[in-house]
Amino acid sequence: MAKKVQAYIKLQVAAGMANPSPPVGPALGQQGVNIMEFCKAFNAKTESVEKGLPIPVVITVYADRSFTFVTKTPPAAILLKKAAGVKSGSGKPNKEKVGKVTTAQVREIAETKAADLTGADVEAMMRSIEGTARSMGLVVED
């Protein structure tokens, strides 16, 4: 028989830098999960990812206090800021442009996020990423 799910916890944790301090500790502690066990497993799984990059993670906590987790790809906005070389998006994206990204960079981001994005093909996923870029005040160039 399958284990009974007690809770789902969604967090964004910096790659390779999970530790028991907030937000990880309190979120897992409330469910009675072994925090250090999660931190070690998460850090081991995200070794190959650039350190400090926020990684969304969904933790499934079972009634017997065991857990499993699934890591996702970094948010598109973070990848776009990194590609454009800017610290933050524009406060007024329609009026003030803060940076530029090329179509090739957008394609690369779409292919990186392909596992998490819903789209018929790479072109559809690229349009989604381009929309995110525009809403951040980034210009997409050919």
Curated annotation (Swiss-Prot):
<dbReference type="InterPro" id="IPR006519">
    <property type="entry name" value="Ribosomal_uL11_bac-typ"/>
</dbReference>
<dbReference type="Pfam" id="PF00298">
    <property type="entry name" value="Ribosomal_L11"/>
</dbReference>
<comment type="function">
    <text>Forms part of the ribosomal stalk which helps the ribosome interact with GTP-bound translation factors.</text>
</comment>
<dbReference type="GO" id="GO:0022625">
    <property type="term" value="C:cytosolic large ribosomal subunit"/>
</dbReference>
<dbReference type="InterPro" id="IPR020784">
    <property type="entry name" value="Ribosomal_uL11_N"/>
</dbReference>
<keyword id="KW-0488">Methylation</keyword>
<comment type="similarity">
    <text>Belongs to the universal ribosomal protein uL11 family.</text>
</comment>
<keyword id="KW-0699">rRNA-binding</keyword>
<dbReference type="GO" id="GO:0003735">
    <property type="term" value="F:structural constituent of ribosome"/>
</dbReference>
<keyword id="KW-0694">RNA-binding</keyword>
<dbReference type="InterPro" id="IPR000911">
    <property type="entry name" value="Ribosomal_uL11"/>
</dbReference>
<dbReference type="InterPro" id="IPR036796">
    <property type="entry name" value="Ribosomal_uL11_N_sf"/>
</dbReference>
<keyword id="KW-0687">Ribonucleoprotein</keyword>
<keyword id="KW-0689">Ribosomal protein</keyword>
<dbReference type="InterPro" id="IPR020785">
    <property type="entry name" value="Ribosomal_uL11_CS"/>
</dbReference>
<comment type="subunit">
    <text>Part of the ribosomal stalk of the 50S ribosomal subunit. Interacts with L10 and the large rRNA to form the base of the stalk. L10 forms an elongated spine to which L12 dimers bind in a sequential fashion forming a multimeric L10(L12)X complex.</text>
</comment>
<dbReference type="InterPro" id="IPR036769">
    <property type="entry name" value="Ribosomal_uL11_C_sf"/>
</dbReference>
<dbReference type="InterPro" id="IPR020783">
    <property type="entry name" value="Ribosomal_uL11_C"/>
</dbReference>
<dbReference type="GO" id="GO:0070180">
    <property type="term" value="F:large ribosomal subunit rRNA binding"/>
</dbReference>
<protein>
    <recommendedName>
        <fullName>Large ribosomal subunit protein uL11</fullName>
    </recommendedName>
</protein>
<dbReference type="Pfam" id="PF03946">
    <property type="entry name" value="Ribosomal_L11_N"/>
</dbReference>
<dbReference type="GO" id="GO:0006412">
    <property type="term" value="P:translation"/>
</dbReference>
